[in-house]
Amino acid sequence: MGWERTKATTMELPGEPSFTGWLLAGGVAAVTGILLFILHASDMVKALAVFNIWWLASSPVLGWFFLFCLRGWLWGRTVSEHQFLQKEAEYGQQQWEVWAGRYLAVLGSSILLPSGVTSDAIAKSDAADAPQFLSLTSHFDAKSTTSTSLLGLGLASVQNAVAMLPATVPFNVTIVSDMISSNFETRFRESWEKIYPGRALTGSISCCEALSFAWIEERLKNPVFDIDLILILQNQGAEQYSDALAALILTSDDVAEKYHLPHSARILRPMLLDMPNFRADMGLFLETQTIACQTSKVFCDYGHWNDWFADLMTASQSHLTPWVPQEIDVLEKYNGIPGAGSAWLLAALLSDITLVGKAPVLGLFTSGTDRFVSTITSGSNNNDAG
């Protein structure tokens, strides 16, 4: 279900009164007054004799002047009402844009793709000659397929980002993996101590097989000052999905601003899509998270998003987006079938791509049975914000 947004009431400004028409009416009133004066003075109409000649002669002009002032007052009130409603609508739109523009700051990110493909090459469109995996791929070295070694690779990939984190802020770890066992947390702690000796884990550690992309929305609603590491590790897909390894260090915008944390990218508030109403939802999304209209490209995690590209392009026409259907890219092309962590894998890839391309991109994410859309933008490393 998409965002429930009630738009402010507005009104069309009617056409302004015709000044020429009112001048003509004033002329007619003046002529009528002159005729009444002549009729009264000549005693041609005895019934007019009971009236004061000057009041009688001036009454058409006075009546016209009264109606002219009344029409001007009514028009002024209509204009004032229109301006008030317009300002209210603009203010409401600004508030919605601020709400939709809240983000999780990406303090560090990495993703391991097969065959030497890098996010840098994808961002620069240099990955066209790389092998395309639209099925399954097992790309981890057989010697490094233990959970301990893969945990070490994931932690080492964000080593520079971890080193810059303030020690006073709680650091939570969420491991999304298909290799979880009873001693998995112990192995993680051992890998952590090996790579980050002397740096204590100050927050919680949780392990799960899937993490909904709706976690971002919940994280933005939660006013807790902490930092989260999300580690995606897939190596047991067999015939269902491909290997994957990615890491994201995230925190909410208020934490990034309070501690002036440099960040490479921003994941803006995602919108849960109602797929039967996909076109309408995309229109609402583009009206609300307006920076999405400036995105240079569109990326999705699974190839099944192809079925919705026509509706996507139709919804975007009125918003003048620069998207071209042929340039919509798919994570599955580079990594094979993404699996349960597809949304987070795409988020990690787009964070890297945004850092390289320095332009916002639109992401279409699959998380279980849910579908999301969000904008990934440059972070404080590329602009004055944050």
Where are these regions (language model features)?
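Conserved "HGTGT" condensation-loop signature of ketosynthase/thiolase-family condensing enzymes
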Residues: 1-225, 234-239, 246-386
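A short, small-residue-rich loop immediately preceding and capping a beta-strand
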Residues: 229-231
